[in-house]
Amino acid sequence: MPITLPATLPAFDVLTHEGVMVMTPERAARQDIRPLRIGLLNLMPKKIQTENQFARLIGATPLQIDFQLIRMTEHQTKNTAAEHMAAFYRPFQEVKHEKFDGLIITGAPIEHLDFSEVTYWDELCEVMDWTQTHVHSTFGVCWGGMAMIYHFHGVPKHMLAAKAFGCFRHRNVAPVSPYLRGFSDDFVIPVSRWTEMRQDEIDAAPGLRTLLASDEVGPCLVEDAGHRALYIFNHFEYDSDTLKQEYDRDIGNGKPINVPRNYYPDDDPTKPPLNRWRSHAHLLYGNWINEIYQSTPYDIQQIGR
């Protein structure tokens, strides 16, 4: 089954060209199927790139997906055209009375700030509390996952002495988890962050279970069954060239940055990078969507009751 997107959303043409099944809302309405309603609370500056990345992953599953784009109500983005935001995004205050089978809360490049210093922190706290009554399963990504684990459990983030940047080996530490069906024991995941969550502090918080971890960059994927949530601190959703774009940007701006580790062949930035995480990215998000499908109420209004 396809993902439902407006025909004018850039992701529609991108995914169609890649062979992902996409349909318009008008066509979806003619099918006698209840699609899974998945929201994307997009906090990233490059909105369109992030839309494409997550739509690609959840659109590759066998289920029909109704993909809804959500923004913070008062925060004004500076990197995406206002026309795009007006055409495709709805503010949280407009959707907060609706129910969702799943919600993805993305990262944001504001790691250097304390959570309380983020201009939209109060509304984001409202969003996170709202997920407990209006969303069946929530997936917090990178800063979004750190924000959720801090909000619900008080586990803090910590600044790193140097940016964790590159493709790092990770271990599958919970192979029986339904979210890790098909996962190898050892694989790489793109990492790009200045902060970390510490394993001992996660272990001390009741109800948290680490599923993926790295000897070099720490815990990666954490399950929070009590809040029906997953938190991932690294970037399975990244395109093949996302780390390259970040590296080239910082080099162009004269910022000190190391070559992303284990990313370019022979660690040579003149060579095209290789994508070694794509299959596991599809597995993780496909497993998440499948778990939602298996457990969400058929009547979406029953979510949270």
UniProtKB/Swiss-Prot annotation:
Compartments where located: Cytoplasm
Protein's gene: metAA
Residues annotated as binding substrate: K163, S192, R249
Pathway: Amino-acid biosynthesis; L-methionine biosynthesis via de novo pathway; O-acetyl-L-homoserine from L-homoserine: step 1/1
HAMAP family given in the database record: MetA_acyltransf
Primary subcellular site in the record, as a coarse category: cytoplasm
Catalytic function, reaction form: L-homoserine + acetyl-CoA = O-acetyl-L-homoserine + CoA
DNA-binding among keywords: no
Record-marked site positions (Important for acyl-CoA specificity): E111
Molecular function GO labels: homoserine O-acetyltransferase activity; homoserine O-succinyltransferase activity
Keyword hit for Amino-acid biosynthesis: yes
Gene Ontology CC entries for this record: cytoplasm
Protein name: Homoserine O-acetyltransferase
EC number per UniProt: 2.3.1.31
Sites marked Important for substrate specificity: S192
InterPro entries, per database record: Class_I_gatase-like, HST_MetA, MetA_family
Function: Transfers an acetyl group from acetyl-CoA to L-homoserine, forming acetyl-L-homoserine.
GO biological process entries: L-methionine biosynthetic process from homoserine via O-succinyl-L-homoserine and cystathionine
Keyword vocabulary terms for this entry: Acyltransferase, Amino-acid biosynthesis, Cytoplasm, Methionine biosynthesis, Transferase
Active site: C142 (acyl-thioester intermediate), H235 (proton acceptor), E237
Alphabetical list of Pfam families matching this protein: HTS
Enzyme class label: transferase
Family: Belongs to the MetA family.
